[in-house]
Amino acid sequence: MADSSERDAGKSAAAGACAVPKTKGRRVQGRRVVESRYLQYDKKAKKVSGAAKEEKPPEGRKASTVPRSREESQVMGTGNLQSTMLEGHGMNPPDLDLSAIDDKILSRKASWPDREMTDKAKSTSFISCDKKRILRKKRRDLQETMDMMESQTLLMTLLSVKMENNLALLEERAEKDLAAMCHEKERLQRQALELRRQLLLRQKHQELAATLDAQIEVLSPLQPVLERFKEEYMTLGRALDTTRHELPMQAVHMEGSGQELLDDLEPALRITLQLLGDLSICSPYATAQVQGASAQEPGASTQLSCLLKELKGLVTEKDLELRRLVSQVVELSSQASKEAALMNQEVWEEAEGALTSSQWYFSPDACRDDSPS
């Protein structure tokens, strides 16, 4: 234990003797001091190794074993240097001052692991930077893709809303146009029906005009005959007006002549005049004549009254007989007209033939069906 403590003290003294304070380079008159580059390199390597120790190793990689090897080398450096030692001499090594040699060896051994450590740290830092850059790029690309998808989704939503609004407007406009077209169609249909009705009416008027023209052409030669017929008809009417008071006398059969009838009616007329005079209806001159006639013949009034009664009874009987005779005559005339019509029909059918008569009595379709093919 005493030997190891003395050895450590010697090493520290040698290290203190070898250590040179770090001074900045400055210009001195007459000479120039150049610092040792070996010490500067050692310091830089130590700084780089310390920075590499602070950095964390990337995931999936094992921590470097350089510090452990360095410690082992330091331990081995402080141990025995002789490999052929006898038993018992390992505990009491020779008392040699190897501090300078150990310091050089340790500094060299420490420099090489630091270099390896810095290279590995640089490589790992480069790899980690590349991975971080790739991850950042991927994240950036993913974010850009998500932003683009969100913008496209928003645009699609806006387009769908616009399409729905435009579709609603188009539907409303189409409904209005359809209603207007329906109204226009109804108006045109009414106009077409009105024009068709007017056309049919004009066609009927034209047909009637053509028929009237044909009738006028056919009847124009008969106009003189019509004028002559009018004149003859007027003459017949005037003749009937002048002779109508004598017509019943020709149709009624009476016994005796007209003079005898007048002689029979003269007393009745006188009584009528007298009665009218009493009622102050007849003139006084006629009443005086009737009274004079009655004064000359005192029994004439009673005779006239009897005659009037008999005339009344006779007229009543004749009236009944005339009514009965008139009904019989009407019946006979109807039968005679029937017989005459049947005879004329038979004669006409014989003259015209069966086909023409069938057209008069039956419809044309029935005649076509019954006609021989």
Swiss-Prot record:
Phosphoserine PTM sites in chain numbering: 99
Compartments, as annotated in UniProt: Cytoplasm; Cytoplasm, Cytoskeleton, Microtubule organizing center, Centrosome; Cytoplasm, Cytoskeleton, Spindle; Cytoplasm, Cytoskeleton, Spindle pole
KW Chaperone (keyword) present: no
Region (Disordered): 1-76
Compositionally skewed regions (Basic and acidic residues) per UniProt: 1-10, 32-43, 52-73
Modification sites for N-acetylalanine: 2
Gene Ontology annotations of biological process type: cell division; centrosome cycle; spindle assembly
Similarity comment: family membership: Belongs to the HAUS8 family.
Gene: Haus8
UniProt subunit comment: Component of the HAUS augmin-like complex. The complex interacts with the gamma-tubulin ring complex and this interaction is required for spindle assembly. Associates with microtubules. The interaction with microtubules is strong during mitosis, while it is weak or absent during interphase. It is unclear whether this interaction is direct or indirect. Interacts with EML3 (phosphorylated at 'Thr-882') and TUBG1.
Native source organism of the sequence: Mus musculus (Mouse)
Key words, A-Z: Acetylation, Cell cycle, Cell division, Coiled coil, Cytoplasm, Cytoskeleton, Microtubule, Mitosis, Phosphoprotein
Coiled coil location: 130-204
Any one cellular-component term (Gene Ontology): centrosome
Known role: Contributes to mitotic spindle assembly, maintenance of centrosome integrity and completion of cytokinesis as part of the HAUS augmin-like complex.
Principal subcellular localization: cytoplasm
Name listed for the protein in its UniProt record: HAUS augmin-like complex subunit 8
Signal sequence coordinates: none
